[in-house]
Curated annotation (Swiss-Prot):
The modification N-acetylserine is found at S2. One of its GO terms (cellular component) is nucleus. This is Histone H2A. SUPFAM superfamilies: Histone-fold. The nucleosome is a histone octamer containing two molecules each of H2A, H2B, H3 and H4 assembled in one H3-H4 heterotetramer and two H2A-H2B heterodimers. The octamer wraps approximately 147 bp of DNA. It is found in: Nucleus; Chromosome. It comes from Sipunculus nudus (Sipunculan worm).
Length: 124
């Protein structure tokens, strides 16, 4: 008698829910935080997986754009300024994070068209 029930397979190496879903973000930790945070009385099994996937996608999107901004400025390290430029130059991310202030982010370079010097016509 092996104590594995009726014809069950031996339990192999445990696999995390993150790796099962093919994610880098921790599904188990997000599930724990959802339960502890009193957001709802009960939390479904799929909710933390979906939330982890959404958070991972948003992080990847912001980091991709910030990496491009860093490369444009000939830098190898992403700083808050690069995050600010990435978010504010992307229409959808700017709308999503409109109420967010990024410390040490600075502002977007912007000069009103009225203030620019007028172009004069050169006659031949």
């Amino acid at each position: 008698m092996s104590g594995r029930g009726k014809g069950g397979k031996a339990k192999g190496k445990s696999k995390s829910r993150s790796s099962r879903a093919g994610l880098q973000f921790p599904v188990g930790r997000i599930h724990r935080l959802l339960r502890k945070g009193n957001y709802a009385e009960r939390i479904g099994a799929g909710a933390p997986v979906y939330l982890a996937a959404v958070m991972e996608y948003l992080a990847a999107e912001v980091l991709e754009l910030a990496g491009n901004a860093a490369r444009d400025n000939k830098k190898t390290r992403i700083i808050p300024r690069h995050l600010q430029l990435a978010i504010r130059n992307d229409e959808e991310l700017n709308k999503l994070l409109s109420g967010v202030t990024i410390a040490q982010g600075g502002v977007l370079p912007n000069i009103q068209a009225v203030l620019l010097p007028k172009k004069t016509q050169k006659s031949k």
